[in-house]
From Swiss-Prot:
Motif position, JAMM motif: 178-191
Chain sites annotated for binding Zn(2+): H178, H180, D191
Protein name: UPF0758 protein BH3032
Source organism: Halalkalibacterium halodurans (strain ATCC BAA-125 / DSM 18197 / FERM 7344 / JCM 9153 / C-125) (Bacillus halodurans)
Family note: Belongs to the UPF0758 family.
Presence of the UniProt keyword Chaperone in the record: no
Amino acid sequence: MSNMSMTLRDVPNRERPRERLLHEGAHALSNQEIVAIMLRTGTKNESVLQLAQHVLCHFDGLRLLREATVEELTSIHGIGEAKAIEFCAAIELGRRIHTMQEMDRYVIRTPEDVSRFVMEEMRFLSQENFVCLYLNTKNQVLHKQTVFIGSLNASIVHPREVFKEALRRSAASLICLHNHPSGDPTPSREDIEVTHRLAQVGKLIGIELLDHVIIGDRTFVSLKEKGHLPFS
């Protein structure tokens, strides 16, 4: 195999990911095989399956791959800009489909429901994201919105921004949440102050703050369960 890059055609028929997908379904493929299909070709010294494994190792499996940028992908030998753009677009499409499926029917009744809804999306974030879930009278998620990115501070997270969307969506209630990039969801004094302030405004305008959930790495804390919601 002199100067030609190695493609999926160089893999024995029965082992080709595309053929396996056709005959066994996408669910039967390994992460490496799915990445290989997306890459299509390897390099003159590395098969496409080897390149796929190289990509997964570079990003610690799927853990960091979901946040991969074009710049990060093109830093890997064998991945050009066009291939990196297609890769990022496929990741974003999968993320959007997942979000739509979740929100179509997702009902929140407990802090565990909140955690299941956002954990995989939020536990890897490198900055604090303050997010609101707006619910209808059946506790179904109407809308999810990131209100603020950065260190949480009672003077920065303004109730106006939180409740403006609640009024626009005719929400019956809302749940606030944010992540701690450290992975430790223990609430800070600022977290508690923000919760009290939003609960007071919600009581005044008739849109109840049901909870404020802090997301860590595979763990979470409900400020309602900790007794920090003054009107619950």
